[in-house]
């Protein structure tokens, strides 16, 4: 009896150990860090949480976990963590740093995964112009998430208060100044601008630089072209909205994209050059504002030389140092699926680069999306070179110096031009 009991105990122990062993993989679940600055931003966080919860429920062996970044210094932090081989498995950036990160070996090429998914047939699902931005030296380092041309939000009630017709928004730079002056009254200002050290500044500055005929680089891409009269004209126009025309709120150097949207949400400004999703963010900032009845979207005013606007291309990348590339790709592919991309538009109003969403009825019939999408043929990007982040940083310094009066626009731009040439020459 004792022997049988002993055998039973030993058998139970073996079975118990087997259960523990078999349960091991669940306990050692693969965690994929999904990094973006939008985890702390409404309404984006709603879409992100829904994605995370849906994926985790459908894939018990993999867990998507939040990894928060900050918009202003995301590139700097990613560089440091990549050098330490501790970067998030999947990270979110706009288009500007992709060549630099690829050149430095921080990003995992996606070509082998794409081939397994069908190669060119798989890639044909996405906006092809945006897809080109993901390519560097013959390899693909990302898929385009969203393609957001810039437009301008205007407060229709403010227009009517000062005798302006919101159905006839400013079409030229001169009209923009005229309207902004009329809209600047009491504690309210005509337009909000970004002066903070963040890449959102370029999406507001660039339409003026390019609209005047300016370019960042010479045609061969080897030298700065910021010493041209055209570049200076656009640069000065942007700066003088604050320094000369006084139609921008105080503290412009501290104002980033979210701060300016907050000004719009609380009716401290009447106009804001913005991304397509800005109206949703404004609604989240001030739920009491009836945004669809208050704000409408219009094109950015046309410059003296050409009609042009900037764009925000959203990209997700997989780190070259991920310890779980197959699991990371599974999460990555899920994010780019039709249902997730459509829900992202429904919640956050970003314009998906996935063609079956972009050309679908919801985006095609949305009043804001229609106006922003119509700006796509006029959208332009900064030079796609590894040196751009450093050149861009010098441009932001110049804008801040000119805004503050520390330097004249001419001197600030001259110094940025010299800095860009040093960068391009490898110094």
Model-based region annotation:
Residues 33, 50-129, 135, 160-165, ...:
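Extracytoplasmic "Venus flytrap"/periplasmic binding protein-like
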Residues 70, 95-151, 177, 201-204, ...:
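Hinge/lid segment of periplasmic solute-binding proteins
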Residues 111-126, 169, 195, 212-233, ...:
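Short, solvent-exposed loop/beta-turn-alpha elements that line the ligand-binding surface or hinge
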Residues 125-126, 295-299, 345-397, 401, ...:
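Long, aromatic- and glycine/proline-rich binding clefts that accommodate carbohydrate-like moieties
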Residues 177-184, 220-252:
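Glycine-centered hinge/linker elements that transmit conformational signals in sensory
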Residues 136-145, 150, 174-224, 269:
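Extracytoplasmic/periplasmic solute-binding protein
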Residues 63, 160-161, 166, 243-246, ...:
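Conserved C-terminal helix/tail region of periplasmic/extracytoplasmic solute-binding proteins
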Residues 37, 56, 203-207, 212, ...:
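Extracytoplasmic/periplasmic substrate-binding proteins
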């Amino acid at each position: 009896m004792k022997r049988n009991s002993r055998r039973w105990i030993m058998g139970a122990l073996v079975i118990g150990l087997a259960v523990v062993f078999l349960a091991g993989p669940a306990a050692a679940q693969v965690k994929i860090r999904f990094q973006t600055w939008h985890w702390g931003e409404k309404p984006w966080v709603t879409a992100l949480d829904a994605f995370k919860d849906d994926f985790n429920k459908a894939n018990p062996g993999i867990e998507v976990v939040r990894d928060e970044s900050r918009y202003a210094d995301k590139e700097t932090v990613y560089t440091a963590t990549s050098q330490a081989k501790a970067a998030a498995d999947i990270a979110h950036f706009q288009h500007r740093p992709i060549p630099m990160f690829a050149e430095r070996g921080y990003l995992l090429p996606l070509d082998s995964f794409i081939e397994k998914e069908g190669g060119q047939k798989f890639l044909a699902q996405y906006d092809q112009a945006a897809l080109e931005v993901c390519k560097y030296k013959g390899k693909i380092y990302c898929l385009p998430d969203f393609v957001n041309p810039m437009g301008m939000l205007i407060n229709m009630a403010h227009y009517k208060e000062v005798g302006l017709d919101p159905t006839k928004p400013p079409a030229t730079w001169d009209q923009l100044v005229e309207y902004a002056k009329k809209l600047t009254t009491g504690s309210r200002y005509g337009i909000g601008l970004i002066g903070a050290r963040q890449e959102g500044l370029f999406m507001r500055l660039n339409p003026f630089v390019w609209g005047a005929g300016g370019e960042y680089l010479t045609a061969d891409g080897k030298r700065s072209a910021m010493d041209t009269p055209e570049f200076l004209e656009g640069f000065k126009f942007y700066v003088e909205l604050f320094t000369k025309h006084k139609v921008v709120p105080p503290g412009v150097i501290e104002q980033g994209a979210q701060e300016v949207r907050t000004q719009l949400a609380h009716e401290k400004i009447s106009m804001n050059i913005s991304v397509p999703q800005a109206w949703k963010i404004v609604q989240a900032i001030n739920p009491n504002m009836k945004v669809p009845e208050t704000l409408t979207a219009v094109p950015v005013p046309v410059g003296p030389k050409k009609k042009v606007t900037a764009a925000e291309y959203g990209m997700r990348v997989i780190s070259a140092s991920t310890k779980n590339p197959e699991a990371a790709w599974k999460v990555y592919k899920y994010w780019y699926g039709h249902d997730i991309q459509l829900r992202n538009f429904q919640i956050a109003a970003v314009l998906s680069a996935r063609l079956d969403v972009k050309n679908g009825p919801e985006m095609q019939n949305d009043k804001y999306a229609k106006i922003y999408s119509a700006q796509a043929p006029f959208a332009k990007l900064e030079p796609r070179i590894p040196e751009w982040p450093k050149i861009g940083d010098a441009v932001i310094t110049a804008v801040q110096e000119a805004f503050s009066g520390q330097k004249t626009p001419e001197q600030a731009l001259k110094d940025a031009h010299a800095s860009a040439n040093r960068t391009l020459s490898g110094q």
